[in-house]
C-alpha cells in the first residue's frame, strides 16, 4: 500500500480510480477467447489492490470458466488487509485444478512498527491473521492454490529481511506440502523506472541479501526467490545499455475502464491503445499504434513515456519477438 492508496486520493498517477464493471469484464474475456488469445498468466492487480473489488471471486471464476486451457494460472496480488476469512473463502473457492491460482501477499515487514512505516497503517497483525487463515484452510480443503510472500527491500525495512525469511519459511514448512509451490520473494525496490536513487536501492538490496545469506533455492517447504539483475536496463548510474523493452510485447494491461495499455510500467497511461469495449484485443495489440511503438524501440528510439524510463530488465526481448514485430510492420505498410 503506497501513499495514493492509504491517503484516499481520487486519482493514482493521473488515472481516475474505479472498479472494472463485471459485464464489461465478461465481454473482454469473451473477446480474448474469440481472438484465440493465450497467456502464461493473468494478474489481477494494477495501480490498486484487487481485494477492494467487491466481486473479486466472481472475476476469478469468470476468467477460469472462459480461459481454461488458454492461461497457465491466475494471480492475485494483494496486501491482504481487506481479506478476512469470509472473503478468503471466496478466493479458495475460485481455485481449480485446470486453472491454478497464485496469491501474492505484499508484506515488506516483520514487525508492526516497520509495517506501519512502510505501508502507512498499523495492520500487520490483521494481515498475518488473514494469511494464516488462508494457509490453514488450503491445507484442510486441499485447494490448488499457491502462495508467494513478498518483501521489497528498502530503507527502513532492510534490517528485518532475515526475520521475515525465518518466520514465513517456518510457517509454510509446517503448513505447506509437496502438492503446492509456495515462494518467498525478495524484490528490489523500483525507483521511478530507474530514476535517481535506483542504484542506491540496488546496493542496499545486494548488501541485505549478503548480510542475511538469503539465496535462491529451497528452504524447508518453500522456494526462496531473489532478484539477481537490476530492475531497469538503464538507471541513475548505468547508461547506454538500453534495448527494445520487452514490456511492449508481453505486459499488456487492461485498465479498470476497459482501456488496453501497452506496458505495465506506463503508470500514467500514455500508451493506451484504445478501449476493449469497442475493439478486439488483437485489433489493438497487433494494430498500427502498437506495432509503430515496437518498431521505434527496435530502431533505438525511446520517445514519450519511454524516454524517461530505464526499460524493463526482468524480462527479455527475444529475437522472435523482434522478428514478429518487423513482419507485422511490413504487413501494415509501416
Question: What positions do the PLM features span?
Answer:
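Conserved beta-strand->loop/alpha-helix structural units within folded catalytic cores of enzymes
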Residues: 1, 40-45, 50-53, 149-150, ...
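Hydrophobic side chains within well-formed alpha-helices
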Residues: 87-88, 281, 305
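Conserved Radical SAM active-site core
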Residues: 11-75, 81-97
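Radical SAM enzyme [4Fe-4S]-AdoMet core and its adjacent flexible, acidic
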Residues: 5-20, 26, 37, 66, ...
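Cysteine/selenocysteine-centered motifs that mediate thiol-based redox chemistry or coordinate metal-sulfur cofactors
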Residues: 286-334
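Local cysteine-cluster metal-coordination motifs and their immediate loop/turn environment
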Residues: 1-6, 262-265, 303-314
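Short, flexible loop/turn elements at secondary-structure junctions
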Residues: 46-48, 78-80, 107-109, 151-153, ...
Amino acid at each position: 500500500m503506497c501513499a495514493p492508496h492509504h491517503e484516499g486520493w481520487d486519482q493514482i498517477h493521473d488515472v481516475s480510480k474505479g472498479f472494472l464493471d463485471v459485464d464489461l469484464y465478461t465481454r473482454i474475456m469473451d473477446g480474448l477467447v474469440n481472438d484465440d488469445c493465450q497467456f502464461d498468466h493473468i494478474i489481477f492487480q494494477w495501480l490498486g489492490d484487487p481485494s477492494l473489488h467487491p466481486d473479486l471471486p466472481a472475476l476469478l471464476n469468470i476468467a477460469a470458466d472462459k480461459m481454461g486451457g488458454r492461461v497457465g494460472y491466475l494471480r492475485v496480488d494483494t496486501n491482504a488487509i481487506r481479506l478476512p476469512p469470509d472473503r478468503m473463502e471466496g478466493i479458495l473457492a475460485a481455485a481449480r485444478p485446470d486453472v491454478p491460482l497464485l496469491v501474492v501477499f505484499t508484506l515488506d515487514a516483520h514487525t508492526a512498527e516497520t509495517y506501519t512505516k512502510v505501508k502507512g497503517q498499523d495492520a500487520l497483525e490483521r494481515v498475518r491473521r488473514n494469511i494464516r487463515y488462508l494457509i490453514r484452510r488450503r491445507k484442510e480443503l486441499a485447494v490448488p492454490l499457491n502462495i508467494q510472500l513478498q518483501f521489497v527491500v528498502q530503507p527502513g525495512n532492510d534490517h528485518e529481511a532475515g526475520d521475515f525469511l525465518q518466520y514465513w519459511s517456518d510457517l509454510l514448512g509446517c503448513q505447506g506440502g509437496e502438492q503446492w509451490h509456495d515462494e518467498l520473494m525478495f524484490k528490489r525496490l523500483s525507483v521511478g523506472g530507474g530514476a535517481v536513487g535506483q542504484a542506491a536501492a540496488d546496493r542496499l538490496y545486494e548488501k541485505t541479501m549478503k548480510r542475511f545469506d538469503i539465496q535462491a533455492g529451497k528452504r524447508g517447504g518453500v522456494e526462496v526467490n531473489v532478484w539477481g539483475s537490476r530492475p531497469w536496463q538503464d538507471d541513475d548510474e548505468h547508461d547506454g545499455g538500453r534495448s527494445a523493452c520487452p514490456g511492449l510485447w508481453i505486459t499488456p494491461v487492461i485498465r479498470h475502464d476497459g482501456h488496453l495499455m501497452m506496458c505495465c510500467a506506463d503508470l500514467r497511461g500514455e500508451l493506451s491503445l484504445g478501449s476493449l469495449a469497442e475493439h478486439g484485443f488483437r485489433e489493438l495489440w497487433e494494430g498500427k499504434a502498437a506495432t509503430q511503438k515496437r518498431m521505434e524501440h527496435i530502431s533505438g528510439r525511446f520517445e514519450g513515456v519511454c524516454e524517461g524510463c530505464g526499460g524493463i530488465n526482468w524480462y527479455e526481448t527475444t529475437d522472435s519477438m523482434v522478428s514478429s514485430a518487423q513482419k507485422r510492420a511490413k504487413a501494415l505498410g509501416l
